[in-house]
Amino acid sequence: MYLIEPFFKLSALENDIGQQSRLLNAVIDQWRYNGQIIGREIPLYLTEEDGEQGFAMRVICPEQDSLLPENNNQSVNQAMEHAEKSGLNFQGFQIIADDLNADSTAECSQPAWQMLYTTHLQSCSPLHSGGDFSPIPLYKQLKNQPHLSQDLIKWQENWQACDQLQMNGSVLEKESLNEISEVNSTLSKHGRYLAAEIEKES
């Protein structure tokens, strides 16, 4: 995975930083639900690049080219259009570094088999290759199914929250453990539903 800095040039005559931040956070959310960026805590800041005022952010991406427009889904493009209407134009990104603490992304995005897997410690796609257990970027398989990709991220967040609670061992430990270990729990049923839907798409 890679640490990347996207830049949005500010071309609006009037600055409403609150509104502009909300629009850019909408882009961040859609990038995240499409699997183009990983994680939820994304720093957003005003900066200058090549003499142009604008906004930048620091994100973790599964691949060097994750933020290229061809990887966008319809929801990402809509969020980008809303930002552009307010004078925020995506100018591109620079690769800062290879993230040495992150998992390596799967080289084959269409393996013979794959699985859903996550833990409270993981910061990567919950879709893993059956061949080498590497995470597969969601946009590689689900770009045309944004609702499914977002649902998968929400499932991962719920699973990780339960895993964290049972690891902490003080609050809701039994209930959380049941959710991630019982075959007929809500989380397990949701995971099986998602696996079946992903199988249809891939």
Question: Where are the predicted features?
Answer:
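Intrinsic low-complexity, intrinsically disordered or marginally ordered coil/linker segments
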Residues: 1-202
